[in-house]
Each structure stands twice: as C-alpha cells, then as structure tokens.
Amino acid sequence: MRTRAKNDKAILFERYWAMLAPAEFEPVSEYPFDKVIGRKHCFDVCFPQYRIGVEVDGGTWMKNGGRHNSEADMEKRNIAASLRWLVFHFTPQMLQRDPDGCVAMVLRAIRDSI
C-alpha cells in the first residue's frame, strides 16, 4: 500500500502534539479510516484505536469558502460520522494561537474514550 506524504498542516499539529501531549498517545498521519467500506479517505492525523481524527483545514484553500466546503469533503465528514469517528477541525492559525487548547481538546476526547 502506498502511503501519502505528510502535509505541512499535519506536521504543524504533530509538532505541537509532541511538545504538549503524553508520549503514550502517538498520532498516525494519513490514515485511511474508511478502508473497511472500500473507500480511500484519510485524516491529516488520527488516533485509530480511539476513532479520533484531526483535520487541519486552511491555507490557500480557505479563501472564498475554500476547498473544505466541497461535496467531497462533506461526503468524507459524513462517512466518518457514519463509522462513529470523532473528527476535530483546526486551522493553522488556531494551532498557532492556542496550541495548548487544541491539544487539550483532542487529549480530553482520547481520555474520555478509554
């Protein structure tokens, strides 16, 4: 199976995660969460054992509504919900402005799922 390269936004989340979260919760990049139904959608970062995904939306796509409002992205969100994944959406600006808060939100969800 071919793995997709990490994008800069995923790297940004992973950098803050490594600095602020316990090492026991290691994120996975570009995980194909819907492979079980024959699809190929991936989260930027996720924690598969807890069914928690992280999408870092933004950059050049955010202007004029952005790519993240497309039908394909809505389908991805709906598939994730139907498979009972909890998905967090952050922008790079949110991560830079409040990395502690973003990491704490995801960490709380992980701990609540244990």
Predicted segment positions?
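Nucleic-acid endo/exonuclease domains
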Residues: 1-114
